[in-house]
Amino acid sequence: MACSTFSKPLKDKINPWGPLIILGILIRAGVSVQHDSPHKVFNVTWRVTNLMTGQTANATSLLGTMTDAFPKLYFDLCDLVGDYWDDPEPDIGDGCRTPGGRRRTRLYDFYVCPGHTVPIGCGGPGEGYCGKWGCETTGQAYWKPSSSWDLISLKRGNTPKDQGPCYDSSVSSDIKGATPGGRCNPLVLEFTDAGKKASWDGPKVWGLRLYRSTGTDPVTRFSLTRRVLNIGPRVPIGPNPVIIDQLPPSRPVQIMLPRPPQPPPPGAASIVPETAPPSQQPGTGDRLLNLVDGAYQALNLTSPDKTQECWLCLVAEPPYYEGVAVLGTYSNHTSAPTNCSVASQHKLTLSEVTGQGLCIGTVPKTHQALCNTTLKTNKGSYYLVAPAGTTWACNTGLTPCLSATVLNRTTDYCVLVELWPRVTYHPPSYVYSQFEKSYRHKREPVSLTLALLLGGLTMGGIAAGVGTGTTALVATQQFQQLHAAVQDDLKEVEKSITNLEKSLTSLSEVVLQNRRGLDLLFLKEGGLCAALKEECCFYADHTGLVRDSMAKLRERLTQRQKLFESSQGWFEGLFNRSPWFTTLISTIMGPLIILLLILLFGPCILNRLVQFVKDRISVVQALVLTQQYHQLKPLEYEPQ
């Protein structure tokens, strides 16, 4: 009898899988800051996917924290095998397509090898990451494969091997012991201690093989993915009701560059411009790169382990920003601050707000899921200013401060939110999967947004710093850079809307001018409407409302900038005004401190060293002198 290619006594079964060199984004690490409560509850979904067929073997959802939402997952071995094996063997059959194939599959042991961390020589996807013995970390076999570092353990369920004929109850309902779908190979997946501590930012892959005494062990692969969602719904807050009808941005039209000006003919007088050209404003590409760079700086400060190797991608379709409702302590002012105006109410709508935070005013039932605490304003004339790094998302628009008088007289409501750009985070496994050879099914990438990774960081950091004196750790240059990038992008949005309003006004003037010309041409017939025998249409100019909203928007952006600058100390402002100052100080601070210590303690240490050497030399000299001379014995005189 021929020996099995994948039998237990053999060691190296195949040549090692050649390494695949992939260029990732290697990023330096920063300082870690705890940014989320460990008691926060999420909607966690675990999904087991057969990578050979793309079918879902198990999808389990539960409510829990990030430290205890690790349930047992139950599914069938045939959900991972499918109807056919890649390399069918005569005694295995085609797979789980027939009752006989399902029954024969149940007779064999199986072992599992990890694909998320592949040891040297364990092969690739084609071998199920089991290129040699010792790569298996779990399974159901006579040698009891196990591991102390793998993330899961996969064993057979409670059904004994000799129970059930593996018939499908929907086809053969009269046969005793038939099960739905003919499932007779139950498996139980449990998380190990290492798996409960691991980062599940992306899908993890394993290979499973049936152990046979002869022939080749058949292979299948499966992935395990965790999806985390906030319990609260994603609802819009703002005055714009047409949010769900947004379309992705159209492709940009190619702009023809103007030809360079021809040099003037000889003898012609050259014209010198009187004014200098205006300073170049940052373009769209620069602003988008600033957003991504600011997102990286903030993420690197809070979670340096996630930025060792990753992809940060800016979402190219609306919504471009999302809000995270937070709890915070606002400031109460009896008079209007200089950076806050009660009358200005611009019309920026935040289309996605998640989480639960502080609400003020009359909150409708559709938005009460966003409220952890709802406050009613007392009567009086005072102003509520949002903390640094946050803003009020109201049904009238985004604003840095509120008027209690306006809230008491109206049914308006506001939610305290943090504003985050829509930047998605992709782990290294997503990049590697793009270069792997696809056999049948391409894995769906799992992405996390910046709001999910950093949501609540501003208020959480401030709350933690009140008792520990570490509030300054949150107000760092990284978060200020992200805040400045968001403000610059909002200013460009305001400019774009203003330019659109001007274009619409110009177009309406052209249309009205054409209308007057046509009325003159058809004057004998009584005008254009009489000639067409239609009702006359008149132009209603609403661009004034847009112009007023844009003026208020510019005013509010200026106020937010003043509020941001007023919250900074003189020391932080010094670093912001001189960006090179940070690099200079960090470069020369170490050598300066070492030089200062040498100047302070160097003379004392040198004197001690010289005195010690002198003492040792004196002792040595004394020893040398004593060795050259010896004491004479006293002479005894005889009496005469």
From Swiss-Prot:
- State the GO CC annotations: host cell plasma membrane; membrane; viral envelope; virion membrane
Regions of this protein lying in the Extracellular compartment: 33-584
Identify the InterPro entries for this entry: FMuLV_rcpt-bd, TLV/ENV_coat_polyprotein
Per the UniProt topology annotation, the Cytoplasmic ranges are: 606-640
**Annotated stretches, region: Disordered:** 259-284
Q: Name one Pfam family in it.
A: TLV_coat
GO terms of biological process kind: fusion of virus membrane with host plasma membrane; symbiont entry into host cell; virion attachment to host cell
Its protein name is Envelope glycoprotein
Q: Which organism is it from?
A: Rauscher mink cell focus-inducing virus
